[in-house]
Amino acid sequence: YTVIAVPALVYAVGAYGFFALPYTILVYPIVFLIMPKLWKVAHAKGHVTAADAVYGRYGSRPLEFAVALTGVVATMPYIALQLIGMEVVIKALGLTGELPLAAAFVILALYTYSAGLRAPALIAFVKDIMIYIVVLVAVVLVPAKLGGYGAVFAHAHDAFAVKGGATGLTLKPAQFLPFATLAIGSALAAFMYPHTLTGIFAARSADTIRKNAVFLPAYTVLLGLIALLGFMAYAAGISVKNNNDVVPALFNALFPSWFTGFAFSAIAIGALVPAAVMSIGAANLFTRNFWKPYVAPDITAAGQEKVAKVVSLIVKAGALIFILFLPTKFALDLQLLGGVWIVQTFPSVVFGLFNISNRFRAPALLAGWAAGMIGGSWLAFADGIKPVHTFVIGGGSYAIYTGLTALIFNVVVAVVVQLLLGKRGEETPALRQSAG
C-alpha cells in the first residue's frame, strides 16, 4: 500500500492520489476516541474479535456471523494488494509472465502455514527498520540526484500538462468531493479490519492505545514523502506500462545494484508481513465466530488452530482470485473495494459502544448491513471495480466513494427498519446486561 500502490496512483493522476494523507489523519481521532472504548468492553467481556463484541452487545448470532463474514471477505482484496506489491518486486528482478504472481502466492502461503502468527511477529521489527532505511534514503538522495524538490515538481507539472485530463499537481474542482469522501470512507473502514482490530484487542490498556495514537501522525508525514516518489519518477525520466512498476523502476535507475536489492527485499517483506497478519486475522475470525458456534461447538484449541490454518490458505487463494479475475486500473482499487465491504460493519461495531446503540436492535442493524453490502457491491461491480460512483442529480454530477455511499444507505435502512419495528421495545438479555 504505502511503497507501491500510493506512489503508483500519484504517478498516474497526481494530487488526487494524495487522498491517502487526509485519510490517515482522520484515522487518528477515531483510534483515540473510539478504540479505547472498544478495548474496555472487550477486556471486560473477554472478546477477541469484532464479531465477539457485536454478539456480546446485541445477543444476535446472525449479526455476529454477518460481521465475521464481512471481515473475511473484505480482507481478501486487501491481501491481493500486498500480493501485487510482492509481484512487482519479483518482476523487477527479471521474472516474466505469471511467474512473479505465482511466486508471491507460494511464498506467502508457505510463510504462514507452517509458523502461523509467529512468522510475521519474528521479522516485523526487521521489516520496519528496512523500510525506514529505504524510505529515508529515497526521499533524501533521489531528489538530490534529480536537482531538488523544485525540479521534481517542475518535471511532474510538465508531464501532467502533456497528459491532460484530471491530472495535475493540484485538484480539479470536480475532484474535491470524491477526494474528500475517499478520505472519510477509508478512515472509517481502516480499523474495522480483523488484523487492525487484533492489535487493538491485544493492547495492554486503553491508555496504551491513546498513547500510540498520539505518535501515529508521524506515519502521515512518512506516507506523504513516499507518495512523492510518483513525482520523482517523472524527473528521472521513468516511463512504465504498468503504474505499479514505477517505484521499482525508479530504484533500478538511480540506486546501485546492492542497495536496489536491499530496497526490493524491504518492499517484499513489507508486503509479506501485513499479508500474513491479515490472512491469519481473517482465519481466526472465521474459526471463532462461525466454525465453533455453528459447526463444531466442542472443538479444542488445537482443532481451532488446524481449521484456522486451512482457512488462512483459502483466504490467500481468494486474494489470488481477485487479482486474476477482477483486474483493476490501479492496485489501490483493491484495497478500496475491501473498504466498501468492511465499513458496513461500522454501525454494528461502533454504535454498540455509545448510547446510540439503545436506539437500534439487531434486526435493524442486520438489515442495514445487508442493504449496504448489496448496494455497495452492486455499485462497485457496475462501475468496473472503480472506487467512486457518480450520481447525476438536478443536472449536476456528484462523485462519491462507493463505500461511503453504501454506509449511508446502511444507516438509513437501519433507521427505517428500527422505526418499523417500533420504539426500543424489550431489550435482549445480552443488551440489557451490556448496558448495565
Predicted features, each with a name:
Residues 1-436:
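Membrane-embedded helix-loop-helix hairpins and adjacent transmembrane boundary segments
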